């Protein structure tokens, strides 16, 4: 059986020479070629330059000719280090190696100096070693993304041989082989046929698009070189799928569904990608209906042949609490208007389904706070409720992960923007009773945000598999927990009936308590103890370990400080840009206000002109009436004059004829 190590390794310069030996550098030209062939070009050149700086010193050799581009690139890398001290070059050499290959030390050759302290599994006596009346606690080293080994005095996380998972209710770190994925968080994880797939995620603010698979039988990592299906036969150069983070990865029909997620250039609506492990091909799933707006950090829950999507954060950083359902038979989206008080807008929460009827939402976060509330949606009546809970409720958290085993919902990780959640808890979904399964201490990957959690099987028993996360450092560790029967059944022994809407489906069964006790005792058989080490070497090892720990913490603090400085500088730049935009907008506002005032003055003048025209129009109407009256009077006068003229021109003949005009005048 392999003997896991629990040490931070030898001190410098021995650690540097061990790393150089692992890389294959011995100062010869052939060794440099080996390095270049094993690592990416930029990493290989930097490792070569640091090795030369540490072993030879500053570059004083003449520049190679342009006909030798490889040698010229190596010379430029070495020359760029200037007068860097040798010890600093050694430290950076090891740091870069650990960033590229975090598990290098465990895979190093046997000629690397052995560490001071060994940790052995399956000793004859499962009791801790006592020396001078003091009990030594177990020690576990968890390697982090940046390669530095963080030593944790915590027996809640132990090393396990890759072929055994025997400790119940305790997190263990199995040995894995193969190239581990780059450390990340906000990735997706799902299991198909005893293989855990890891897709996408976030690393140093960059979205990832790689796909890795872990064989859960052999614990071997491998990267999947995927293809992208073309939409038609005419398309010969399909565009690659955009890297993403904050998406959901669901196993469906021996395929993987990647739903939503944040991307560099987000689409307007939520997209669903499909990966077929048989053809190693990604393709876009064609859906119908009105899809949800593009988002990340949502929860996606498989309920029968449907996917239930809740919440998340859209591309404009607006938090959501809407509810959508995708029917996998018809591939049709449907937006649900539920009744009752829905959860507040949030992202990075966890969701589970109970009895194929009740959707449970726990935790999550907004821009300012994290939540610890539990909401239940009845999928038959589409009504939200907040039922009463039992036990000790978990602390507020976001970025946690959850899986269900029967009626039990296991919640792992998460954080509250201050620290990671150290307790792994379980909720019995029938009784709504919380209990703690395991607890970890220190800054370990399990107390991280954005980790993933899946369920696997080992010797017929369920095992929780956690991967990745971010707790100030990016992680790519695998941790396992095998819940005992007692932990999965202890909430069922409560006598109180289930409150709220879940009481109708409370069909919990009782089991033999004595067998639970036996299993619990069996789970405590495995202990990790320290080998017999003479006091002198132990004190020396402790001193070296303390110094290494202090140096590691110093480096972490320096890295955190540099990161904070970069963030502060970025925020200042963004603030300056915002102030500049604000100034421009204010100038535009003043200009618009001036234009508005001019338009208002012009409108006022127009109103005055209109009033004057109206007054003149009224005067014209009066004059028109007077004119018409005068015209009528004139016409009457002219008519009278004509009549008088006619009467005056009759003469003698008119008098002799009897003046017929007079008759006409006298006639009515």
Swiss-Prot record:
GO terms for molecular function: fatty-acyl-CoA binding. An acyl-CoA binds at residues 33, 48-52, 74. Pfam families: ACBP (PF00887), ACBP4_C (PF24922), Kelch_KLHDC2_KLHL20_DRC7 (PF24681). Changing residue 25 to T: Reduction of oleoyl-CoA-binding activity. The modification Phosphoserine is found at residues 515, 520. Its main location: cytoplasm. Changing residue 28 to A: Reduction of oleoyl-CoA-binding activity. Mostly expressed in roots, stems, and leaves, and, to a lower extent, in flowers and siliques. This is Acyl-CoA-binding domain-containing protein 4. The lineage of its organism: Eukaryota, Viridiplantae, Streptophyta, Embryophyta, Tracheophyta. The gene is ACBP4.
């Amino acid at each position: 059986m392999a003997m896991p190590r629990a040490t931070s390794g030898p001190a410098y310069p021995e650690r540097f020479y061990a790393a150089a030996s692992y890389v294959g550098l011995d100062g010869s030209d052939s060794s440099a070629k080996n390095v270049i062939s094993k690592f990416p070009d930029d990493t290989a050149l930097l490792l070569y330059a640091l090795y030369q700086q540490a072993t030879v010193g500053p570059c004083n050799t003449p520049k190679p000719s342009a006909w030798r581009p490889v040698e010229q690139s190596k010379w430029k890398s070495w020359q760029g280090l200037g007068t860097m001290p040798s010890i600093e070059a050694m430290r950076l050499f090891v740091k870069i190696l650990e960033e590229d290959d975090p598990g290098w030390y465990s895979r190093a050759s046997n000629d690397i100096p052995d560490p001071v302290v060994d940790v052995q599994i399956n000793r004859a006596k499962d009791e801790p070693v006592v020396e001078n009346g003091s009990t030594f606690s177990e020690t576990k080293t968890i390697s982090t993304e940046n390669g530095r080994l963080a030593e944790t005095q915590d027996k809640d996380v132990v090393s396990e041989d890759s072929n055994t998972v025997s400790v119940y209710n305790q997190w263990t770190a199995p040995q894995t082989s193969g190239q581990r994925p780059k450390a990340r968080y906000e990735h997706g994880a799902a299991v198909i046929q005893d293989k855990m797939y890891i897709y996408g995620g976030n690393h140093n603010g960059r979205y990832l698009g790689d796909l890795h698979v872990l064989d859960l039988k052999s614990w071997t990592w491998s990267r999947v070189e995927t293809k992208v299906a073309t939409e038609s036969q005419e398309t010969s150069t399909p565009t690659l799928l955009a890297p993403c983070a904050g998406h959901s990865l669901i196993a469906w029909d021996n395929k993987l569904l990647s739903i939503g997620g944040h991307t560099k250039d987000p689409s307007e609506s939520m997209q669903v990608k499909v990966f077929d492990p048989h053809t190693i091909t990604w393709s876009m799933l064609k859906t119908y209906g009105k899809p949800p707006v593009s988002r990340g950090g949502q929860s996606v829950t498989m309920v029968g042949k449907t996917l239930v999507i809740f919440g998340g954060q859209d591309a404009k950083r607006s938090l959501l609490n809407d509810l959508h359902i995708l029917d996998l038979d018809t591939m049709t989206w449907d937006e649900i208007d539920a009744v009752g008080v829905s959860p507040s807008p949030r992202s990075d929460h966890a969701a589970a389904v109970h009895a194929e009827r009740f959707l449970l939402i726990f935790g999550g976060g907004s821009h300012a706070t994290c939540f610890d509330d539990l909401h239940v949606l009845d999928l038959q009546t589409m009504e939200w409720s907040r039922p009463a809970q039992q036990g000790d409720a978990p602390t507020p958290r976001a970025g946690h992960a959850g899986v269900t085993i029967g009626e039990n919902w296991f919640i792992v990780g998460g954080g509250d923007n201050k620290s990671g959640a150290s307790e792994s808890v379980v909720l019995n979904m029938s009784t709504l009773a919380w209990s703690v399964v395991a607890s970890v201490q220190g800054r370990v990957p399990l107390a991280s945000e954005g980790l993933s959690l899946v369920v696997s099987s080992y010797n017929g028993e369920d095992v929780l598999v956690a991967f990745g996360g971010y707790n100030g450092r990016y992680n790519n560790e695998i941790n396992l927990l095998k819940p005992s029967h007692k932990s999965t059944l202890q909430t069922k022994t409560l006598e109180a009936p289930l409150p709220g809407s879940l009481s109708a489906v409370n069909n919990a069964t009782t089991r033999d308590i004595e067998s639970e006790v036996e299993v619990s005792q069996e789970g405590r058989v495995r202990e990790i103890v320290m080998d017999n080490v003479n006091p002198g070497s132990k004190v020396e090892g402790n001193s070296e370990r303390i110094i290494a720990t202090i140096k590691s913490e110093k480096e972490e603090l320096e890295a955190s400080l540099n990161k904070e400085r970069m963030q502060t500088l970025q925020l200042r730049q963004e603030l300056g840009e915002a102030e500049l935009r604000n100034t421009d907008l204010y100038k535009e506002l003043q200009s618009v206000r001036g234009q508005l005032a001019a338009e208002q003055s012009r409108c006022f003048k127009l109103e005055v002109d209109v009033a004057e025209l109206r007054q003149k129009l009224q005067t014209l109407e009066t004059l028109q009436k007077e004119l018409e009256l005068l015209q009528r009077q004139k016409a009457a006068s002219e008519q009278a004059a004509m009549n008088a003229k006619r009467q005056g021109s009759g003469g003698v003949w008119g008098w002799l004829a009897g003046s017929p005009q007079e008759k006409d005048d006298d006639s009515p």
